[in-house]
Swiss-Prot record:
UniProt-recorded name of the protein: Streptolysin O
Residue ranges, annotated region (Disordered): 37-64, 84-111
Positions with biased composition (Basic and acidic residues): 53-64
Record's signal peptide: 1-36
Purpose of the protein: A cholesterol-dependent toxin that causes cytolysis by forming pores in cholesterol containing host membranes. After binding to target membranes, the protein undergoes a major conformation change, leading to its insertion in the host membrane and formation of an oligomeric pore complex. Cholesterol is required for binding to host membranes, membrane insertion and pore formation; cholesterol binding is mediated by a Thr-Leu pair in the C-terminus. Can be reversibly inactivated by oxidation.
Oligomer status and interactors: Homooligomeric pore complex of 35 to 50 subunits; when inserted in the host membrane.
Motif mapping: Conserved undecapeptide: 532-542
Transmembrane segments: 263-276, 283-292, 361-370, 378-390
Predominant subcellular localization, coarse grouping: secreted
Keyword DNA damage: no
Length: 574
């Protein structure tokens, strides 16, 4: 019933619309008839014809039109309207097109400069990267294993770095090319920069390959990633064809190393995403935090050439004049995320080396550093022992990485060969983007990520159980006092000291006498005293040995000998 009612209403309004249209037509007819009657009256005066038709009066015409409209209103038939396209639509299209052309011709250079210069921000704050915050940790822990006692010591450390060259990974090369525009926001600090894509002015770029002179600089009309990459490829090919002289180009090497304690710490120390290191080198951060492993990472950045983009005198120099600040705002530009300009990109390869050991020696870092610097560690027994119980991994990113994609070995000489191999630029060993530097578009100040992080430096020291060998060969009566502490740690890392003493302290011993006193691996503060009876009334007892800080060793040999008036004592270690 409701549908039927709607149809009737629709028909009624259709008839009303038709009636209005008909009224307009009738009005035109009445006007036309009136003009026709005037014409006929004029003709009557000059004709001789006796029979002249009487024109319909306007009243009659109106009456017929009214009757027709009533019939239309009372009819159930739909009135179809077919409006014609008005010529005005075409005119509106032309007008809109003209307005668009005017907008594209408008110069917004002054507006862009004013707005970017007026951006209010702190360079260090907008690019601050706050890593881990350490609240609770166990400062010390003791672990007993057979004849070993391992002390794991943890210290809270802070690291604050501001690197200006940022490592490039494959996923961001399309937004870290020379002259690219970026936002100084969280994404930039995490090596995932947000690009600002808009209409650009032509941009000059320069490559620092030797011998090219003026040919080393070209202008890219539309500096997109594809166009800039093509221009760089052309420059490199020109150098190979015309300026290399068939020679290779040695790399400029930058080297950094650091022990690994946590993800945020190694990111800040080496300026590289820990996920890349973890994925390529397989760093076991859990074992490191437990003190079970010690790991050092070295990064060799081998640069073949650098491509620089000419810095703009004013911010608007990089934009087409049609670009508005409103458009830049829509794409993220603000006080919290000011625009950046990629000023240069280094091309070459990066070699990451992981040195890993389960040794608890305090000389691990020194041994690893010596190996990386090419020092002959075979002459140093401690270093040699550490390296013999270590494993090494090298990963090459960029250049001819297929040859040495990942190498795992126990022989560090193999790692040295990986570092040296393919360290020269040639057609067979091409360069890849490895790092870039950006500047703030407002003032061309270098944009450095301000890394602030806390981390726990974990060191582990391994102690082995020992013993004291007492030997009395003197011509006198002797007495001993042997004391030591046994160290443990509670669940909060607090040191717990248990006092220990030899059961035969102060017992008189005649020569020859010998015995063995076992010491646990957690023994500290060892004191050894031996005295002899002189028989002299004024000096009945005389000390032969009195050592209060004897170090724990596998064997501590305590020997006393001589006569009452000339005793002799010594402590040796084995």
């Amino acid at each position: 019933m409701k549908d039927m009612s709607n149809k009737k209403i629709f028909k009624k309004y259709s008839r009303v619309a038709g009636l209005l249209t008909a009224a307009l037509i009738v009005g035109n007819l009445v006007t036309a008839n009136a003009d026709s009657n005037k014409q006929n009256t004029a003709n009557t005066e000059t004709t001789t014809t006796n029979e002249q038709p009487k024109p319909e009066s306007s009243e009659l015409t109106t009456e017929k039109a009214g009757q027709k409209m009533d019939d239309m209103l009372n009819s159930n038939d739909m009135i179809k309207l077919a409006p014609k396209e008005m010529p005005l639509e075409s005119a509106e299209k032309e007008e809109k097109k003209s307005e668009d052309n005017k907008k594209s011709e408008e110069d917004h250079t002054e507006e862009i400069n004013d707005k970017i210069y007026s951006l209010n921000y702190n360079e260090l704050e907008v690019l601050a990267k706050n890593g881990e915050t350490i609240e609770n940790f166990v400062p010390k822990e003791g672990v007993k294993k057979a004849d070993k006692f391992i002390v794991i010591e943890r210290k809270k450390k802070n690291i604050n770095t501001t690197p200006v060259d940022i490592s490039i990974i494959d996923s961001v090369t399309d937004r870290t090319y020379p002259a690219a525009l970026q936002l100084a926001n969280k994404g930039f600090t995490e090596n995932k920069p947000d690009a600002v894509v808009t209409k650009r002015n032509p941009q000059k770029i320069h490559i620092d390959l030797p011998g090219m002179g003026d040919k080393a600089t070209v202008e890219v009309n539309d500096p997109t990633y594809a166009n800039v990459s093509t221009a760089i490829d052309n420059l490199v090919n020109q150098w190979h064809d015309n300026y290399s002289g068939g020679n290779t180009l040695p790399a400029r090497t930058q080297y950094t190393e650091s022990m690994v304690y946590s993800k945020s710490q190694i990111e800040a120390a080496l300026n590289v995403n820990s996920k890349i290191l973890d994925g390529t080198l397989g760093i076991d951060f859990k074992s490191i935090s437990k003190g079970e492993k010690k790991v050092m990472i070295a990064a060799y950045k081998q640069i073949f050439y650098t491509v620089s983009a000419n810095l703009p005198n004013n911010p608007a120099d990089v934009f087409d004049k049609s670009v508005t600040f409103k458009e830049l705002q829509a794409k993220g530009v603000s006080n919290e995320a000011p625009p950046l300009f990629v000023s240069n990109v280094a091309y070459g390869r990066t070699v990451f080396v992981k040195l890993e050991t389960s040794s608890k020696s305090n000389d691990v870092e020194a041994a690893f550093s010596a190996a990386l610097k090419g020092t002959d560690v075979k002459t140093n027994g401690k270093y040699s022992d550490i390296l013999e119980n270590s494993s090494f991994t090298a990963v090459v990113l960029g250049a001819d990485a297929a040859e040495h994609n990942k190498v795992v070995t126990k022989d560090f000489d193999v790692i040295r060969n990986v570092i040296k191999a393919n360290a020269t630029f040639s057609r067979k060993n091409p360069a890849y983007p490895i790092s870039y530097t950006s500047v703030f578009l407002k003032n061309n100040k270098i944009a450095g990520v301000n890394n602030r992080s806390e981390y726990v430096e974990t060191t582990s020291t391994e102690y082995t159980s020992g013993k004291i060998n007492l030997s009395h060969q003197g011509a006198y009566v002797a007495q001993y006092e042997i004391l030591w502490d046994e160290i443990n740690y509670d669940d909060k890392g607090k040191e717990v000291i248990t006092k220990r003493r030899w059961d035969n302290n102060w017992y008189s011993k005649t020569s020859p006498f010998s015995t063995v006193i076992p010491l646990g691996a957690n023994s500290r503060n060892i004191r050894i005293m031996a005295r002899e009876c002189t028989g002299l009334a004024w000096e009945w007892w005389r000390k032969v040995i009195d050592e209060r800080d004897v170090k724990l060793s596998k064997e501590i040999n305590v020997n006393i000998s001589g006569s009452t008036l000339s005793p002799y004592g010594s402590i040796t270690y084995k």
